[in-house]
Each structure stands twice: as structure tokens, then as C-alpha cells.
Amino acid sequence: MDSINKDVLDACRGLAAYGMGTGIGGQISIRIPGEELMVSHAFDKTFEEMHEADIFTVDFNGNPVGTNRPVSIGIEFHHGIYRQRPDVNAIIHSHGFWATTQAALARPLRIFANVTTPFYGKTCTSPNDDFASIGPALGEEDIAIIIPWHGVITIGNGIAEAVAYHTTFDYGARQDLTLPADTPTMPEDQIAEIATMVNGTGYYKHTWDLVRRTGQECYNGTRVFPRLIP
């Protein structure tokens, strides 16, 4: 199995293990270097159900290559982002409960933990999930996109970053949604320093490795059964 295809499959199963793949919808993609192509997956299965045959190449017009399997219409914003942001090589959009509920607030995360500091000032809000809406909203350094009443997109220079951002956003959303509205957030003068520290620790690679391991542990040979999250 091609390494990019395997990374997409591992991301599907890993996010499923974290409870972000229980329903139809969402997309994971990785850019194929030097070509207007990406690797994504079929629309008619959940992340929990993905197998090798469900992973395939998609062109930048949103058409599957070499298969007639259906692909999500939402894939349109993926190639739009890849064209606008050459630094982005992987994109994640899921309908996990916490991130989707957070999106209903139509605002960035409140910062309560060191690992969520990288989202401060690098999260945009798009009024819709088409690229005509996302493109103008997306800044040059943004790593997350909130679509109100829909969900969240995370983007990274590779699959490790994109997946780690996604699971970390989900963690931050749980904090934001369960802590009282008057809970003090991290002081602004500390956020940049801590974000620099987080970005330099190898956190994203280690988190990706953890997510991948967890997906493998929760896969029973047929599908992924999500782990219990405290």
C-alpha cells in the first residue's frame, strides 16, 4: 500500500478511535507532491469502516482517479486550500461531537491549556464550507477553520500536524464547552511564549504516532471501535 494512502487510512482509523468518525461525512486528504492530485477516501463509509480499497487519488477538480467510488462534495475546499496555501499538505475535517458543538459558538477556542495555545490568533471563521467562503477567510498562518453550526477544519504541513491539530482542537473544545463562562483564560502575554514551546517539542509528531497507535489498537480487523475518552 502506498505510504500516502496508508497515512490517510491510519488517520481515518485514528480519528475514529478518538470518536470523530461515527457518522457519514468529513474528509481527510494529503497532497501528492508536485501534482494537482491528493489522496482521500470514499464518502459512503465512516472513518470507523475505512479499508485500503476505500482510499484513492482525487484530482483538483474533485474527481476520483481510477475508481467510480463516491467522494464527498466537500472535497472542493481541499483543492482550493492546497492552491491558495502551498505550505499546506494535509487537511482534516470531521464531525466529531465536541468540535462540531464548539463550532456552533462561531468563535475561536478560549485558551485554557498549553497545547491549545498554537490556535490563538491562527483560527479563522468561515460563513460556509465552500471554498468561495473559506478562501477569503483563511489567513496565511491559520491552522484551523471554524464553520459555524457545521464543524472544524485543521490544516498542516503534513498529516502529523493536521491530525495533531484536530485532536488537540477537540480537547480544547471539551475544555471550552464544559468550563464555566467566567473561567479565566490563559493570560495573553503567556500564550505566544508557550505556543513557541509547544511548536518546538515534537508534540505534533508524537501525537500523530499516538493517534495512529490508538487506531490500530481499536481496529478489530473489520472496523474501529472508539476508545472511551475520560
Protein language model regions, located:
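Glycine-rich flexible loops
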Residues: 1-230
